[in-house]
Swiss-Prot record:
Its main location: virion. It comes from the Viruses. Influenza RNA polymerase is composed of three subunits: PB1, PB2 and PA. Interacts (via N-terminus) with PB1 (via C-terminus). Interacts with nucleoprotein NP (via N-terminus). Interacts (via N-terminus) with host MAVS (via N-terminus); this interaction inhibits host innate immune response. This is Polymerase basic protein 2. It comes from Influenza A virus (strain A/New Zealand:South Canterbury/35/2000 H1N1). The lineage of its organism: Viruses, Riboviria, Orthornavirae, Negarnaviricota, Polyploviricotina. It holds the Pfam family Flu_PB2_1st. Transmembrane segments: none annotated. Keywords: Cap snatching, Eukaryotic host gene expression shutoff by virus, Eukaryotic host transcription shutoff by virus, Host gene expression shutoff by virus, Host mitochondrion, Host nucleus, Host-virus interaction, Inhibition of host innate immune response by virus, Inhibition of host MAVS by virus, Inhibition of host RLR pathway by virus, Inhibition of host RNA polymerase II by virus, mRNA capping, mRNA processing, Viral immunoevasion, Viral transcription, Virion. One of its GO terms (cellular component) is host cell mitochondrion.
Length: 759
């Protein structure tokens, strides 16, 4: 206090002020501080001081030939005095203005190409719409977000190779461009940048922006796609938000969004097939998103979402070490636990076998619309601090945390039996049983939980079983906070294993993800997703299954035909017929299958009854496990367009219509393809199929014994000849080929030769 008084006293004297403002600084320590080292100590002051001088800039002497001595206003642009200590000219800031207005103009053609990301940003902002500003508390949580719209998804190393190849093509150094995207981008950029005068370093920087995903860990309250993040400073403050609709979309956001939809569809579909893991891999490998293979996107794209991570785990890629439960991402921030099995009784006296985690642990829980901090001990919730966008989101988080705590009062709150099943009709595990039960109705759970008086803590408030806020009481251990809980920032990836049923575990055996955790939300993808796998035919409904099944048979008719005659069981078990079964009424599937298989067997036995159209039409029905019955059918029912429609065993119907003249098949009025051979040639089809591997020598030759049936042919040795009965009772002489290589041509020549031999 004394010192301050003394200073005030000094400052009141005019002499003090004069000394401090006018006298030179000549204290050695101060001079040293500001003059030692190359580093500028006060850059802004230095800049202001320099710019106040007449000629603060130096330039090469050649500039005097390019800039006049005075501008239009008669102001001097450069000094005739040389810069001390160098042979450069001293120049006025006015010279820069003159140069910008009157200097030489280079071609600007490359600017939009190089500064593509900036030009696109301007367009997005021009067409974007900003809505009203709302003042309200912003619950922001830090999330890892993409801050660079419009980029490809190359790794830093891949991008580096592309940049070197584009900008410095002649530099030495090992660059191997392997991925398809690398090659495409390199070719495209080399063409764009011919005769480009922009400095290579600048080009390299801009290319990096275009090729690599840049992420930051930022506090966000609203949308997290990159076109929202680029205007984060305009759309949300501490206590306000401004509505904004982006004026354009960017490929990287579309890829992320479409990848999530494709992954969810694939995981949901795989979960109900006989071998989920194999099916999932088959689908990932045969799917394209926006024309790029899904597996390539999975390798490069860092999106963390349950279904995406299951697909990555199946491909052997590393994923985040956090685990998922009830749609929330849990990350253990401290503590540890050991697992043991324990049997518990629900309020309905049903026995559940739980894997109990013993020990004290703390978790952060991050969901789409709510976040929380959870502290728990063995089967006991100690504290839960929740924040969320609305009451519904807060309820969801509380239910998940209460179930996760495994507390006895939660298990005793179960009313009725727990028998929830997944899509494949298998019972869910006990934790998911409990979760589904209380997600449907949490009333009893909240009432049974118990309440406690609370202390007044800043920013926290109590919540009662009926979800009303309170400052006096709250459900035991539960508080609602105004502040969000940050997402776990560590981007570490761990090695995981995945079992047949798509359960993903870390190296300690903890389950991180399972199909139960995959969201049921349906969305429309921004990019075209092309599922080539037959398992995904049903994604567009029953009609698509019907059309795709018949298209597949027609496309593969050559091989289908051979299998039909030689190895029907293998054909019936093909996975391409699996989706079709869901269209056939369950009660009659087996009878249909038995009937069609018997019909087919007769066709094989009684020559001349082979009918291509009929085989194609009825084949999918034969795939179900057959029931032997004496029933005959004149039509078979399929459930499409919301009702049963009939396929006639003999003849056309709206469902299956074959036009003999055009050889086109229409299914439900939609084109399903053309048959390359004429089904009217009666038996030609099966003959040529079975006679692959045999050479037709001519008419019957009695010396080679009685005519064999087509099925007996398989016993011939190579080079052996035999008469064979074909078609409408005609007999021809054949020889089994000595070489297998020419088998392919047989079926074409067979048809012609049979005709010649018979005529």
């Amino acid at each position: 206090m004394e010192r301050i008084k003394e200073l005030r006293n000094l400052m009141s004297q005019s002499r003090t002020r004069e000394i401090l403002t006018k006298t030179t600084v000549d204290h050695m320590a101060i001079i040293k501080k500001y003059t030692s080292g190359r580093q500028e100590k006060n850059p802004s002051l230095r800049m202001k001081w320099m710019m106040a001088m007449k000629y603060p800039i130096t330039a090469d002497k050649r500039i005097t030939e390019m800039i006049p001595e005075r501008n239009e206003q008669g102001q001097t642009l450069w000094s005739k005095v040389n810069d001390a200590g160098s042979d450069r000219v001293m120049i006025s800031p006015l010279a820069v203005t003159w140069w910008n207005r009157n200097g030489p103009v280079a071609s600007t053609i490359h600017y939009p190409k190089i500064y593509k990301t900036y030009f696109e940003k301007v367009e997005r902002l021009k067409h974007g719409t900003f809505g009203p500003v709302h003042f309200r508390n912003q619950v922001k949580i830090r999330r890892r977000v993409d801050i660079n719209p419009g980029h490809a998804d190359l790794s830093a190393k891949e991008a580096q190779d592309v940049i070197m190849e584009v900008v410095f093509p002649n530099e030495v150094g090992a660059r191997i461009l392997t991925s398809e995207s690398q090659l495409t981008i390199t070719k495209e950029k080399k063409e764009e940048l011919q005769n480009c005068k922009i400095s290579p370093l600048m080009v390299a920087y801009m290319l990096e922006r275009e090729l690599v995903r840049k992420t930051r860990f930022l506090p966000v309250a609203g949308g997290t796609s990159s076109v929202y993040i680029e205007v984060l400073h305009l759309t949300q403050g501490t206590c306000w938000e401004q509505m904004y609709t982006p004026g354009g979309e960017v490929k990287n956001d579309d890829v992320d969004q479409s990848l999530i939809i494709a992954a969810r569809n694939i995981v949901r579909r795989a979960a109900v097939s006989a071998d989920p893991l194999a099916s999932l891999l088959e689908m990932c490998h045969s799917t394209q998103i926006g024309g790029t293979r899904m597996v390539d996107i999975l390798r490069q794209n860092p999106t963390e979402e349950q279904a995406v991570d299951i697909c990555k785990a199946a491909m052997g890629l590393r994923i985040s070490s956090s685990f998922s439960f009830g749609g929330f991402t849990f990350k253990r921030t401290s503590g540890s636990s050991v697992k043991r099995e324990e049997e518990v009784l629900t309020g309905n006296l049903q026995t559940l076998k739980l894997t109990v985690h013993e020990g004290y642990e703390e978790f952060t829980m991050v969901g789409k619309r709510a976040t929380a901090i959870l502290r728990k001990a063995t089967r006991r919730l100690i504290q839960l601090i929740v924040s969320g966008r609305d009451e519904q989101s807060i309820v969801e988080a509380i239910v998940v945390a209460m179930v996760f705590s495994q507390e006895d009062c939660m298990i005793k709150a179960v009313r009725g039996d727990l028998n929830f099943v997944n899509r494949a009709n298998q019972r869910l595990n006990p934790m998911h049983q409990l979760l589904r039960h209380f997600q449907k109705d949490a009333k009893v759970l909240f009432l049974n939980w118990g309440i406690e008086p609370i202390d007044n803590v800043m920013g926290m408030i109590g919540i009662l079983p009926g979800m009303t806020p309170s400052t006096e009481m709250s459900m035991r251990g539960v508080r609602v906070s105004k502040m969000g809980v940050d997402e776990y920032s560590n981007a570490e990836r761990v090695v995981v294993s995945i079992d047949r049923f798509l359960r993903v575990r870390d190296q300690r055996g903890n389950v991180l993800l399972s199909p139960e955790e995959v969201s049921e939300t349906q969305g429309t993808e921004k990019l075209t997703i092309t599922y080539s796998s037959s398992m995904m035919w049903e994604i567009n409904g029953p009609e698509s299954v019907l059309i795709n099944t018949y298209q597949w048979i027609i496309r593969n008719w050559e091989t289908v035909k051979i299998q039909w005659s030689q190895n029907p069981t293998m054909l019936y078990n093909k996975m391409e017929f699996e989706p079709f079964q869901s269209l056939v009424p369950k009660a009659i599937r087996g009878q249909y299958s038995g009937f069609v298989r018997t019909l087919f067997q007769q066709m094989r036995d009684v020559l001349g009854t082979f009918d291509t159209t009929q085989i194609i039409k009825l084949l999918p029905f034969a795939a179900a496990p057959p029931k032997q019955s004496r029933m005959q059918f004149s039509s078979l029912t399929v459930n499409v367009r919301g009702s049963g429609m009939r396929i006639l065993v003999r003849g056309n119907s709206p469902v299956f219509n074959y036009n003999k003249t055009t050889k086109r098949l229409t299914v439900l009025g939609k084109d399903a393809g053309t048959l390359t051979e004429d089904p009217d040639e009666g038996t030609a089809g099966v003959e040529s199929a079975v006679l692959r591997g045999f050479l037709i020598l001519g008419k019957e030759d009695r010396r080679y014994g009685p005519a064999l049936s087509i099925n007996e042919l398989s016993n011939l040795a190579k080079g052996e000849k035999a008469n064979v009965l074909i078609g409408q009772g005609d007999v021809v002489l054949v020889m089994k080929r000595k070489r297998d290589s020419s088998i392919l041509t047989d079926s074409q020549t067979a048809t012609k030769r049979i005709r010649m031999a018979i005529n």
